[in-house]
Amino acid sequence: MEEIQVTFLNMLKVERNFSAHTLKSYHDDLVQFNHFLEQELINLRTFEYKDARNYLSYLYSQNLKRTTVSRKISTLRTFYEFWMTQDETIINPFVQLVHPKKENYLPQFFYEEEMEALFETVAKDTKKGLRDRVILELLYATGIRVSELVNIQLKDIDMSLPGVKVLGKGNKERFVPFGEFCRQSIEQYLREFKPIQHTKHSFLLVNMNGAPITERGVRYVLNDVVKRTAGVTEIHPHKLRHTFATHLLNQGADLRTVQSLLGHVNLSTTGRYTHVSNQQLRKVYLNAHPRAKKESK
């Protein structure tokens, strides 16, 4: 990897406070780009617009989703923008490239009865169950990202309100409330889960050895819960984030409030990540449209 690319990644880590997961995506995008340059015998410095178009075609030939192609092009556009600040002779070859349109899709979410089934699966009387329940409760009750979840420290939890302070993207801090079920789960976990009582750190969530749990560890916990839950086949942390937002909107929460809770800068981002179910759309329509129902005579 070129020195300027390493400097770029360090900038994203130090100045923009990107998560390890996001940094890996940027790194992998640059590695793939470098591989293309080697194949085509193109120099990074002399790479130009026609080469950018060829690279776009190359990405599509790999049968990648449009959203993935869009992200990879965005990575390179951002990289060249950074390089231009370091070297006045550099021109961004991706600036004129038409951004691939993203596919429209409805984010996956759990129905309320599916969430209840997940909670019923988690044991209430085992050490592991106490910890796993807190993970599930916090993700569903607050809609926080998994990267935010694993970085919660004991001082971030406020049992009086109750709620949690999280550090989101761009090093932005926000407070997210949670309900009584979540509060009780956290209290029982802190009171009875032995590994956390003997730690030398202040992270809320730990593994069975008392070390801070990782994002990978959280995904393992969720997959284990799903395997034991009838009628539920797939789960990931962001699906719980979608579920959190969807259920709030279905119960009448306004988009601005959900935006604040999710930690989104732009309302349009919230619009992409949240939606109401088809059943709720029909319910609103039937209640609101003057000719939705035919009156009986």
UniProtKB/Swiss-Prot annotation:
Record gene name: xerC
Entry keyword set: Cell cycle, Cell division, Chromosome partition, Cytoplasm, DNA integration, DNA recombination, DNA-binding
Keyword Cell membrane: no
Active-site residue list: 145, 169, 238, 241, 264, 273
Annotated Core-binding (CB) domain residues: 1-84
Family: Belongs to the 'phage' integrase family. XerC subfamily.
Organism expressing this protein natively: Staphylococcus haemolyticus (strain JCSC1435)
Name used for this protein in its record: Tyrosine recombinase XerC
Gene Ontology biological process terms in this record: cell division; chromosome segregation; DNA transposition
Coiled-coil spans in chain: none
Assembly notes: Forms a cyclic heterotetrameric complex composed of two molecules of XerC and two molecules of XerD.
Residue intervals of the Tyr recombinase domain: 105-286
Localisation per UniProt entry: Cytoplasm
A cellular component annotation (GO) from this entry: cytoplasm
Free-text function comment from the UniProt entry: Site-specific tyrosine recombinase, which acts by catalyzing the cutting and rejoining of the recombining DNA molecules. The XerC-XerD complex is essential to convert dimers of the bacterial chromosome into monomers to permit their segregation at cell division. It also contributes to the segregational stability of plasmids.
Gene Ontology terms for molecular function: DNA binding; tyrosine-based site-specific recombinase activity
